[in-house]
A protein has these predicted regions:
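Active-site catalytic pocket residues across diverse enzymes, especially alpha/beta-hydrolases
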Residues: 17-20, 69-73
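A glycine-rich beta-strand to alpha-helix segment
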Residues: 52-70
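An N-terminal RHG(E/S)-centered segment typical of histidine phosphatases
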Residues: 49, 63, 101-120
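Phosphate-coordination/substrate-recognition cap region in phosphate-metabolizing enzymes
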Residues: 1-51
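Alpha-helix N-cap/helix-start capping motif
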Residues: 6-10, 59-60, 88
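Short, solvent-exposed coil/turn elements at secondary-structure transition points
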Residues: 31-34, 97, 117
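Domain-level recognition of soluble alpha/beta enzyme cores
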Residues: 73-112
Length: 120
């Protein structure tokens, strides 16, 4: 788990900690950004030994990063929802067949879930 160092992101991590007990949490100042290119650069530097990542960050960087990674998923109702609005505390799950995080920008991801707080 990678998280911004901002208070709201840290508070979000505290809420989900019971569900991710044995998972390392790394707080990164770099994720306190509103720029999707910085987010993409961060993702591309993740070690390839890590196969699954959760990033707690900020908009518009999160929304724009999801849109960049899932751009080929054109028929997706979930993609349309992400394009329309990515509210505070929303969760989006993406999958891909990439083997190297450095290729994340070259390979498109598929949106598996998009959950907004009002749906909970």
């Amino acid at each position: 788990v990678f998280s911004s160092t901002a208070l709201r992101a840290v508070e979000t991590i505290e809420i989900i900690k019971p569900s991710i007990k044995d998972t390392e949490i790394i707080y990164e100042k770099e994720l306190y950004t509103f720029d999707d290119q910085i987010m993409m650069d961060f993702i591309s530097k993740i070690t390839d030994e890590i196969s699954s990542v959760l990033i707690v960050g900020h908009n518009p960087a999160i929304q724009e990063t999801v849109l960049r990674l899932s751009g080929s998923d054109q028929n997706s109702n979930l993609l349309n929802r992400v394009e329309h609005k990515y509210p505070t505390a929303a969760f989006c799950s993406l999958t891909s067949t990439i083997e190297k995080w450095a290729h994340a920008g070259d390979t498109m991801f598929k949106i598996q879930e998009f959950i907004c707080p009002k749906e909970l």
